[in-house]
């Protein structure tokens, strides 16, 4: 099992990534949401410059945030700083688009973008379209093409992983990606892996960039964790602070499905959505009574994966916390055993800020990683 820390990109995260590397974490994942976090590539660049072994990945980059040659150049540049340690996780967009009042990207556009990105990172010529114009593009100053190696690095492979929960997304994972990113909220790994493997078989795709079994995708599950201290309850203030903000985004998605502009996320619960709509109206009106109703989504996504808004804790239940890797060291280890048994290769553990990162790094590193790896 690989162990990752997942960070809502704050620019000084390199300090926590450095500590995570020392504690035995194998991966650091960075969120890409331009209106609520620091720039993901700038944050990764600092982490790359200040670490030696830990792998660095986006979780996940959003196609509409940057045209494909910009994303390719960014990833290849980080790969120059951290050769062979870069992974591009990519998805159709949740907060990266919902914070702009937009739904997730359509699958046809998404597939085209992923295919072009992989082509560019593999040093190929790619047909790029802007409006009604189609033009061939490539990373011109790669070492192989120009002899220069001071701009970026595509000689060391950069795996591209696709985030997907539904069947159409899983089809794309199998057809063109190097691995699969999903969430621990609705654990669909046992059903998803066979579908992805079948899609890969039909298209002739291989997952060999991660080594091991080339026919099975490398699977990363995004979740969160808090190692309970002796006598501590899952409902403690510390657990709520560290884990709660990673759970309410699911409620935000339910609100979007019923009331917001990002209605194609596929996460719906009308009852919870109605309760949250009532809450967010009261919260927004208290904060700024003059906020127009058509900007309500801006209040919804405040605090996303970073903190709980006042009153938002009522949407974090013990049942939701139980779905995360929160518990005693023995309980967490048992959950990891189960995840490993169903084909999960990497757990990406969300933190909300540097304080929660340092707590997780210390507790999970000492009581889980060290015990399981013997290091």
Annotated model-derived regions:
Residues 1-11, 61-68, 155-165, 225-228, ...:
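Active-site mouth loops of central-metabolism enzymes
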Residues 1-59, 158:
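N-terminal beta1-alpha1-beta2 module of alpha/beta enzyme domains
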Residues 3-7, 28-30, 55-59, 86-90, ...:
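Hydrophobic faces of well-ordered beta-strands that scaffold small-molecule active sites
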Residues 18-22, 44-55, 75-86, 174, ...:
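Acidic (Asp/Glu)-rich catalytic clusters
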Residues 41-58, 113, 120, 364-375:
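Alpha-helix-loop-beta-strand connector modules within alpha/beta enzyme cores
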Residues 103, 107-150, 191-338:
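An alpha-helical appendage that flanks or caps ligand/catalytic pockets
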């Amino acid at each position: 099992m690989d162990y990752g820390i997942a960070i809502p990109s704050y620019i000084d995260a390199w300090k926590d990534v450095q500590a995570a590397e020392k504690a035995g974490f194998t991966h650091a994942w960075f969120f890409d949401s331009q209106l609520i976090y620091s720039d993901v590539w700038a944050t990764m660049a600092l982490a790359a410059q200040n670490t030696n072994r830990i792998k660095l990945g986006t979780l996940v980059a959003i196609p509409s945030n940057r045209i494909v040659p910009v994303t390719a150049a960014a990833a290849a540049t980080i790969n120059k700083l951290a050769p062979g340690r870069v992974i591009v996780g990519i998805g159709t967009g949740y907060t990266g688009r919902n914070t702009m009042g937009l739904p997730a990207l359509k699958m046809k556009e998404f597939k085209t973008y992923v295919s072009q990105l992989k082509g560019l990172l593999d040093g190929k010529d790619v047909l790029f379209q802007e409006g009604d114009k189609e033009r061939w593009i490539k990373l011109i100053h790669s070492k192989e093409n120009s002899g220069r190696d001071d701009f970026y690095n595509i000689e060391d492979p950069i795996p591209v992983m696709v985030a997907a929960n539904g069947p159409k997304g899983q089809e794309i994972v199998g057809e063109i990606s190097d691995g699969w990113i999903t969430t621990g909220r609705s654990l669909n790994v046992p059903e998803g892996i066979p579908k992805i493997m079948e899609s890969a078989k039909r298209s002739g795709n291989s997952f060999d960039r991660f080594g091991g079994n080339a026919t099975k995708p490398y699977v990363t599950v995004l979740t969160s964790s808090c190692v309970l201290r002796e006598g501590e309850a899952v409902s403690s203030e510390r657990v709520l602070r560290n884990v709660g903000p990673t759970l309410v985004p699911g409620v935000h998605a339910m609100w979007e499905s019923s009331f917001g502009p990002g209605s194609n996320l596929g996460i719906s619960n009308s009852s919870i959505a109605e309760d949250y709509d009532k809450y967010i109206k009261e919260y927004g009106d208290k904060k700024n009574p003059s906020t127009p109703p058509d900007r309500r989504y801006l209040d919804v996504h405040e605090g996303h994966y970073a903190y709980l808004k006042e009153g938002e804790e009522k949407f974090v239940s013990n049942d939701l916390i139980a779905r995360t890797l929160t518990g005693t060291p023995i309980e967490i280890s048992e959950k990891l055993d189960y995840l490993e048994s169903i084909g999960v290769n990497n757990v990406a553990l969300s933190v909300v800020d540097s304080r929660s990162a340092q707590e997780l790094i210390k507790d999970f590193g000492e009581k889980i990683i060290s015990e399981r790896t013997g290091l």
